[in-house]
């Protein structure tokens, strides 16, 4: 499972012109599920997302986690992040999980996040979404489980 996290001052996701998820300061995470992923992969990614120290402390060092600042977590499914881009000029999506597995594991990640953190929003799995964000830094990390 891959999670491309971006530290944001605010972010929202829209489907057909309707805002379906939004957060203020926190993390926007684009999530890709791969065929070998399991619920344990999702749990491991969530642990990292909640505890990864990407927010500045009083001295300007990245020492604080999402939990430390009580920030928002916006999860957005993005199967294209799992693409194989090693050869040719067109991405191959054979390395992405089938839609049923992707949806199940994304839902697992979302439900666990809601239980453990509280300030959680999401896009809509499989939908054509427009994501708006104010990237803070920018600070972006690719986490993989």
Swiss-Prot record:
Q: How does it assemble?
A: Homodimer.
Name of the protein described by the UniProt record: D-aminoacyl-tRNA deacylase
**Localization:** Cytoplasm
Q: What is its EC number?
A: 3.1.1.96
Task: Please report any disulfide bonds recorded for this protein chain, giving both cysteine positions.
Answer: none
* InterPro entries named in the record: Daa-tRNA_deacyls_DTD, DTD-like_sf
Q: Which family does it belong to?
A: Belongs to the DTD family.
Q: Which organism is it from?
A: Pseudomonas fluorescens (strain SBW25)
Protein function: An aminoacyl-tRNA editing enzyme that deacylates mischarged D-aminoacyl-tRNAs. Also deacylates mischarged glycyl-tRNA(Ala), protecting cells against glycine mischarging by AlaRS. Acts via tRNA-based rather than protein-based catalysis; rejects L-amino acids rather than detecting D-amino acids in the active site. By recycling D-aminoacyl-tRNA to D-amino acids and free tRNA molecules, this enzyme counteracts the toxicity associated with the formation of D-aminoacyl-tRNA entities in vivo and helps enforce protein L-homochirality.
- The residues that cross the membrane are none
Query: GO: which molecular function terms?
Result: D-tyrosyl-tRNA(Tyr) deacylase activity; Gly-tRNA(Ala) deacylase activity; Ser(Gly)-tRNA(Ala) hydrolase activity; tRNA binding
**What is one process in the GO biological process aspect for this record?**
D-amino acid catabolic process
**Which Gene Ontology cellular-component terms appear in the entry?**
cytoplasm
Its EC top class is hydrolase
What this protein catalyses is: glycyl-tRNA(Ala) + H2O = tRNA(Ala) + glycine + H(+); a D-aminoacyl-tRNA + H2O = a tRNA + a D-alpha-amino acid + H(+)
Per the record, the domain comment is: A Gly-cisPro motif from one monomer fits into the active site of the other monomer to allow specific chiral rejection of L-amino acids.
Alphabetically ordered keywords of this record: Cytoplasm, Hydrolase, RNA-binding, tRNA-binding
Per the Swiss-Prot or TrEMBL record, what residue ranges does the short sequence motif Gly-cisPro motif, important for rejection of L-amino acids cover? 137-138
């Amino acid at each position: 499972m891959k999670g491309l996290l971006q530290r944001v001052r605010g972010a929202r996701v829209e489907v057909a012109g309707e805002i379906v998820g939004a957060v203020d300061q926190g993390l926007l995470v684009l999530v890709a599920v791969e065929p070998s992923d399991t619920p344990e992969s999702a749990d491991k990614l969530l642990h990292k997302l909640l505890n990864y120290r990407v927010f500045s402390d009083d001295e300007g060092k990245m020492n604080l986690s999402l939990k430390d600042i009580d920030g928002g977590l916006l999860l957005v499914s993005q199967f294209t992040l799992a693409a194989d881009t090693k050869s040719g000029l067109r991405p191959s999506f054979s390395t992405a999980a089938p839609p049923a597995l992707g949806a199940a594991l994304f839902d697992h990640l979302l439900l666990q996040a809601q239980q453990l953190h509280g300030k959680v929003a999401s896009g809509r799995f499989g939908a054509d979404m427009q994501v708006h964000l104010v990237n803070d830094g920018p600070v972006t990390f690719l986490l993989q489980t």
